[in-house]
Amino acid sequence: MKNTILILFTAFIALLGFFGMSAEALADPLAEPLADPNAEADPEALKLKSIVSWAKKVLG
């Protein structure tokens, strides 16, 4: 039984990856797909965005 649940969960995650869905998209299906990252949902993405914008300013 435990192995069956593990296999089904792994298959579900693989299908999500196959169709290109992220956890944030599943959590907020009404969100604009091209919008900036939600700071509450993904603080790591917000940090990355600020680093990229800083690099753009420094490099021109």
UniProtKB/Swiss-Prot annotation:
Expressed by the venom gland. The modification Leucine amide is found at residue 59. Residues 28-45 form a propeptide. One of its GO terms (cellular component) is membrane. The keyword Secreted applies. It comes from the Eukaryota. The keyword Membrane applies. It is found in: Secreted; Target cell membrane. Its main location: secreted. Belongs to the MCD family. Mastoparan subfamily. This is Mastoparan-B. It comes from Vespa basalis. The lineage of its organism: Eukaryota, Metazoa, Ecdysozoa, Arthropoda, Hexapoda.
